[in-house]
Design a protein with these regions (language model features):
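Secondary-structure end/capping motifs
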Residues: 303-409
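N-terminal secretory signal peptides and thylakoid transit peptides that target proteins
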Residues: 52-78
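Short glycine- and hydrophobic/aromatic-rich loop-to-beta-strand nucleating segment
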Residues: 190-191, 293-296, 300-301
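Glycine- and small hydrophobic-enriched segments that form the cores of compact globular domains
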Residues: 74-87, 92-94, 126, 154-158
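Ligand-binding pocket segment of bilobal, Venus flytrap-like solute-binding proteins
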Residues: 153-155, 244-276, 297, 329, ...
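Short, glycine-/small- and polar/acidic-enriched structural segments
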Residues: 94-235, 239-242, 251-268, 274-288, ...
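N-terminal secretory signal peptides
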Residues: 1-62, 84-90
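Conserved C-terminal helix/tail region of periplasmic/extracytoplasmic solute-binding proteins
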Residues: 382-457
Length: 457
């Protein structure tokens, strides 16, 4: 068929290869043909439409059955709810067009999870993308959320559950938000006060006071999961309070808390200051778990498609650089200064290289203590939503897969990861295990029901 037949027609089959044999793939074929036709704008839109439909329906038979069932107009309306199709068409038409808003403010919390965002300023990634970005150090997550919602920040470093919570109106007014990139995986730890070094069994923690960075954080959900698996009810047997990361070590030193599940360099700084020890890395709870994310409102994405693409591309390229272990010391020097993390370089190096003192007299070598994989797996979002539901933050029925698709923009990540020289996965969901228990993203309600300790009926 012609590469430009209507992808919203149930009668059309979308092939997977280049028809003329002169291009490496169908997308290149389509783009080249669009440039050669008399109406490139209209045909360019068709390229975008086909790309979107192929991403949503990898099996063409499923696309055709869907269109026969609901019709093209209903399909267009449904897709527009979670994908800015008009903005994508405009961005394609403009190509590497004018950046709508070159001067930006992006908020961040001074933790190593924000490494790709922070390093993009001193190491020139934003500048090479044609952007003048002011990365603004911010005190805590509630402030990040409020400043972003009030449009004081154009985009922000957020905890990966936050865009989901904001979109659903949990803890704030509902505003559609997006996560086009995960900032880091792993990179957190449970740290206890030195006085508790003989209490390594979580069943001994009854009555402990713990800090987490925010109510809507992977830290809160992992701590709750961990203690519940050891028989403690996180709402009744321990106390969990939200404390901004820059204040955690001081609270541990002052004996206001017994420990925290926190991002780095907070854990390593507690060891450096001699007030705490690292009980365990969160990678040993869930290997490869997401933590923080690059987030922007859907309004920003729609109104500034070229700016959004340039910003995300810069962060993806920084992420690709950060994935290589040989670059970690250079990155540590770039992000340690006072205007960024405000930490001794040795503390940041221990986190990024994975060779670190644990506070118990040992030097551990864990190269993937923190890593950087930007792909926003839909299954990550679904797991987070199950924990929101499990602990009573999310009420009523929820279409887990729909929310995941709307917020975690896997299609955008795939394209820009390729441009940055990374290899994105071929699927958007996967099974994984948390403390040995498999999570199937296709069965979220059964997963919630399987837990003995929960706040749901």
């Amino acid at each position: 068929m012609s590469a430009f037949k209507d992808p919203f027609s149930a009668e059309v089959k979308l092939g997977q290869g280049c028809e003329c044999g002169l291009h490496t793939d169908s997308a290149t074929h389509d783009a080249d043909l669009a440039r050669r036709t008399s109406d490139p704008e209209a045909l360019g839109s068709r390229v975008v439409d086909q790309a979107v439909m192929r991403a949503l329906f990898p099996q063409d038979g499923a696309r055709r059955r869907f269109l026969k069932a609901v019709g093209a107009n209903t399909a267009l309306a449904a897709i527009a709810q979670f994908f800015p199709l008009g903005a994508a068409r405009e961005a394609f038409a403009q190509g590497n067009g004018r950046i709508e808003k070159p001067n930006l403010k992006v908020g961040f919390i001074p933790i190593t999870c924000a490494t790709p965002i922070i390093m993009s300023q001193p190491m020139g990634y934003f500048g090479r993308a044609g952007l003048n970005v002011d990365v603004v150090k911010t005190a805590g997550w509630a402030v990040i959320r409020d400043k972003t919602l009030n449009k004081e920040y154009d985009a922000a470093h957020m905890l990966s559950p936050m865009p989901l919570a904001i979109t659903l109106g949990i803890g704030s007014r509902p505003i559609p938000y997006t996560t086009p990139a995960i900032e880091n995986i792993n990179g957190q730890a449970i740290t206890l006060a030195i006085k508790h070094k003989d209490k390594r069994d979580p069943r001994q923690w009854k009555g402990f006071k713990f800090a987490v960075p925010f109510d809507y954080s992977i830290h809160n959900y992992l701590l709750r999961y961990f203690v519940a698996e050891h028989g403690l009810d996180p709402d009744r047997d321990i106390q969990i309070r939200a404390v901004p990361p820059p204040e955690m070590v001081a609270n541990l030193r002052a004996d206001n808390i017994d420990g925290f599940l926190a991002p780095d360099p907070v854990n390593q700084r507690a060891v450096y200051d001699g007030v705490g020890f690292i009980h365990m890395l969160t990678k040993d709870i869930w290997e490869g778990h997401p933590c923080c994310a690059f987030a922007a409102s859907r309004e920003f994405v729609t109104q500034n498609p070229n700016t959004y693409r340039a910003l995300l591309k810069a962060i993806m390229e920084a992420t690709a650089f950060a994935t290589r272990p040989e670059n970690r010391k250079q990155i540590a020097e770039a992000i340690a200064p006072a205007n960024y993390l405000n930490q001794p370089v040795t503390v940041v190096e221990q986190v990024l290289t994975g060779t670190f003192a644990d506070g118990l007299g040992n030097v551990q070598k864990v190269p993937n203590r923190i890593d950087f994989d930007p792909f926003p797996w839909h299954s990550f979002a679904i797991w987070i939503l199950t924990q929101m539901k499990r602990w009573g933050q999310l009420k009523g029925d929820v279409d887990y897969a729909k929310v995941a698709r709307e917020v975690f923009l896997a299609t955008d990540a795939t394209r820009l990861m390729k441009e940055a020289g990374m290899k994105p996965p071929s699927a958007t969901s996967k099974k994984f295990s948390v403390m040995g228990k498999e999570f199937d993203p296709a069965r979220p309600d059964a997963y919630i029901a399987s837990f003995a300790i929960k706040r749901t009926a």
